[in-house]
């Protein structure tokens, strides 16, 4: 007899969901429930969602030299990718040149090395920056890398007002989950808001921050904690920007978010829907913006790298496919699908192509893109959405009581929370309560890698 899991990965009970009450509380499409494109944006930020325009297929890439990464970029664009996403190596993320002693052994290892504007020229050689949007996963030295990008756009004759893209620029999650920071928290926050102010006046189509739950989820937090911690960080950035003299409508329309898409399909869909509604409520209540876009949560999604296994790696292609499906069902604005071999090393050209094809198959063959918020009205999904809003909202209030996200970072509050959730997850793996096919269970099977 199959042993079913009674709880989601965040600990929500599945077996005692009050289906009828959930339907009554959540409402149904066409029954007075807000439509897609209408506040609070639970069902999506655009009325037609993917019926009129697909999400941006933005594969994360970067390795070795700028020249080699440029070749991968151009290959992906030729294969149908619709946006760029740059991975930088650790020395670049820490503001170190490749010949710095502390960079030894790390140059070009997990991303591309950018030491100078010459490297940036090579990175975007033969790529029209006026025709493609570029996301740069860079935080502590975000101002420097953006300055290089703008300089290359200037050389190409692309107006600064026309360049489109994103810098992650989310330093709080570096203190919480990654550790790639350079300056103390308060000074780092000042640099973050300085970039927002510059873009307001010079690059109005540039997303000045991508508030990231992804890295905290990879470090071990739950879906509920991912939403709560991410939106709490976003509130801190918003308050800091306003304290610096910016108005909410000066920068909030160009704030973006970045979430993980993990294994629990329905919980992940509910998570995305909940994050949109909760962010709308938080912004409207505290800041009262006039522009509609100031309270809309736009987000990028990446499939969960932490779920990939080195054992039986072809299984990862299946994991990535259904994680990508969750992101699309949840209304993501852009998506990166991991390559099946990433637990073993940098993706090959072939595995990167398969990852891109996964998105294209979902877009063109499944019919999912032809319906808006197709799981709306599901008793289970609506109940999960409501619970995540409630529990994540409680977490945000607790962080505010403790002085806000910045003060909690200094005390280690978020870090401790993530460590505890990661430990719980590890215990479930070790006891067999959580299955990982090919690594924890069914390990005796060997899948062929050649025909």
Positions of predicted regions on the chain:
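Catalytic alpha/beta active-site cores
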Residues: 1-262, 267, 286-289, 293-300, ...
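A glycine-rich phosphate-binding loop feature that marks nucleotide/adenosyl-phosphate handling sites
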Residues: 90, 167-172, 210-218, 252-262, ...
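Short glycine/threonine-rich loop-to-helix capping motif typified by GTGT followed
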Residues: 145, 220-228, 262-274, 303-317, ...
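Phosphate/diphosphate-binding loops
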Residues: 186-196, 313-316, 392-410
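Mobile "lid/hinge" segments at catalytic clefts and subdomain interfaces of large enzymes
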Residues: 195-196, 200-238, 318-392
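Glycine-rich anion/phosphate-binding loop at the beta-strand->alpha-helix junction
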Residues: 231-234, 267-355
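Conserved small/polar residues in nucleotide/adenosyl-binding loops
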Residues: 443-449
């Amino acid at each position: 007899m199959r042993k079913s899991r009674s709880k989601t990965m965040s600990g929500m009970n599945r077996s005692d969901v009050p289906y009828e009450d959930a339907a009554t509380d959540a409402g149904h499409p066409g029954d007075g429930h807000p439509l897609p494109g209408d506040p609070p944006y639970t069902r999506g930020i655009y009325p037609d969602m993917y019926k009129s325009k697909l999400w941006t297929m933005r594969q994360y890439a970067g390795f070795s030299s700028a020249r080699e990464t440029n070749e991968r970029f151009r290959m992906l664009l030729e294969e149908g990718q619709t946006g760029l996403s740059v991975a930088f190596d650790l020395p670049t993320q820490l503001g170190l040149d490749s010949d710095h002693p502390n960079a030894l052994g790390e140059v070009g290892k997990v991303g591309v090395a950018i030491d100078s504007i010459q490297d940036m020229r090579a990175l975007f050689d033969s790529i029209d920056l006026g025709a493609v949007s570029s996301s740069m996963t860079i935080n502590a030295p975000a101002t420097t890398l953006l300055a290089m990008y703008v300089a290359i756009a200037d050389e190409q004759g692309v107006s600064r007002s026309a360049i489109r893209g994103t810098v992650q620029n989310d330093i709080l999650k570096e203190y919480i989950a990654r550790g790639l920071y350079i300056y103390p928290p308060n000074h780092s926050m000042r640099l973050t808001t300085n970039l927002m102010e510059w873009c307001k006046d010079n690059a109005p189509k540039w997303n000045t921050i991508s508030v990231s739950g992804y890295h905290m989820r990879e470090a071990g937090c739950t879906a509920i904690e991912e939403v709560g911690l991410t939106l709490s960080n976003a509130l801190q950035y918003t308050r800091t920007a306003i304290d610096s003299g910016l108005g909410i409508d000066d920068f909030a329309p160009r704030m973006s978010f970045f979430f993980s898409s993990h294994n629990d399909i329905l919980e992940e869909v509910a998570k995305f829907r909940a994050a949109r509604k909760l962010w709308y409520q938080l912004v409207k209540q505290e800041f009262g913006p006039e522009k509609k876009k100031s309270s809309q949560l736009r987000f990028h999604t990446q499939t969960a790298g932490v779920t990939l296994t080195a054992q039986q790696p072809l299984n990862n292609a299946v994991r990535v496919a259904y994680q990508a499906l969750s992101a699309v069902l949840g209304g993501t604005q852009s998506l990166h699908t991991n390559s099946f071999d990433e637990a073993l090393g940098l993706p090959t050209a072939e595995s990167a192509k398969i990852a891109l094809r996964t998105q294209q198959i979902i877009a063109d063959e499944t019919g999912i893109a032809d319906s808006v918020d197709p799981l709306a009205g599901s008793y289970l999904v609506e109940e999960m959405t409501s619970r995540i809003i409630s529990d994540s909202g409680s977490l945000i209030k607790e962080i505010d009581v403790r002085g806000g996200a910045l003060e909690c970072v200094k005390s280690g509050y978020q870090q401790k929370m993530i460590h505890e959730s990661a430990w719980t997850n590890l215990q479930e793996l070790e006891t067999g309560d959580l299955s990982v096919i090919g690594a924890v269970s069914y390990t005796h099977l060997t899948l062929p890698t050649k025909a």
